[in-house]
Swiss-Prot record:
Homology family: Belongs to the glycosyltransferase 2 family.
Protein source organism: Bacillus subtilis (strain 168)
EC primary class: transferase
Induction line: Repressed by SinR.
Assigned keywords, A-Z: Exopolysaccharide synthesis, Glycosyltransferase, Transferase
Chain's gene name: epsE
EC number(s) recorded for this UniProt protein: 2.4.-.-
UniProt KW Transferase keyword: yes
Protein name stated in the entry: Putative glycosyltransferase EpsE
GO biological-process terms attached to the record: polysaccharide biosynthetic process
GO molecular function terms attached to this record: glycosyltransferase activity
Any Pfam family the entry gives: Glycos_transf_2
Length: 278
């Protein structure tokens, strides 16, 4: 039986000096207290490492700080965190996002009660420099078919059983999955026959600035299309789903301003009753 923390929160951090302290404070403020936070600095070039060191020194019993000697990107950083994690449950958080106080409490309670689920996600509020723009609430029980159309879980919100992460061997750190390590993870997750659940309330805040779509290259869109194709083939989805392979390619040719307007409309187009947070 694990005598250490029940939950390991893993956070890959890179050049997030403006937001890191607030993100860490949101974990320190959790109503659920049996956790450890593992930070992996990915060779930051700003003040991120200095801030992380301050928190790790002040909360040495709760916060572990590890470092990549060179910049290896998010998947490698998360795997580095996983190699140091001791919890039965692994929770994700990004260094520019926030968790509401009862997030960990509610996710632990769900996994303790529902042993047949390997992961539990939550809804999330989307915010930028101007405030909250909307919410994203995904289906409560996503089926493999969702992989052709979009993501089954909001990656930053998840809590997964450590045993499931071990079975999946963590994240694949290869060029094809850069910035899509979560999509690749969910493809392998469904291939393994695992099941997940999304709590129908927003317990997380994700920061999406106005330049989010300017940073997505055509190469990214090609790799995204390849992953959609692999999902259709490996999960044996119906032929009608193959049309979604074109979706990331179409988006690649859309002006960033158009994509931002579409995205803003999409996140705002949620049922108001679903946007609960505690």
């Amino acid at each position: 039986m694990n005598s250490g923390p029940k939950v390991s929160v893993i956070m890959g951090i890179y050049n997030c000096e403006r937001t890191l302290a607030e993100s860490i404070e949101s974990i320190l403020s959790q109503s659920y207290k049996n956790w450890e936070l593992i930070l992996c600095d990915d060779a930051s070039t700003d003040g991120t490492l200095r801030i992380a060191k301050q928190y790790a020194a002040h909360y040495s019993d709760r916060i572990k700080l590890i470092q990549n000697k060179t910049n290896k990107r998010l998947a490698a950083s998360l795997n580095h965190c996983l190699s140091h994690a001791t919890g039965d449950y692994i929770a994700r958080q990004d260094g520019d996002d926030l968790s509401f106080p009862r997030r960990l409490e509610k996710q632990v309670a769900f996994l303790e009660k529902h042993r047949h689920y390997q992961v539990v996600g939550t809804g999330m509020l989307v915010f930028d420099e101007f405030g909250v723009r909307g919410a994203r609430i995904l289906p409560s029980v996503p089926e493999p078919g969702i992989m052709a159309k979009g993501t089954p879980f909001c990656h930053g919100t998840i809590m997964m059983r450590a045993s499931a992460y071990r079975t999946l061997k963590g994240y694949r750190s290869v060029r094809r999955t850069r910035r899509m390590e979560d999509i690749d993870l969910w493809l392998r997750f469904f291939e393994e026959g695992f099941r997940g659940y999304n709590l129908q309330e927003a317990l997380y805040k994700v920061r999406e600035d106005s330049d989010a779509f300017k940073r997505r290259s055509f190469t990214y869109s090609i790799d995204n299309a390849i992953l959609v194709y692999q999902a259709c083939r490996r999960l044996k989805l119906p032929l009608s789903d193959y049309i979604y392979i074109a979706k990331p390619l179409i988006r690649a040719f859309m002006p960033a301003a158009v994509m931002n307007r579409y995205h803003k409309k999409r996140v705002m187009n949620q049922k108001e009753g679903l946007v609960k947070h505690e």
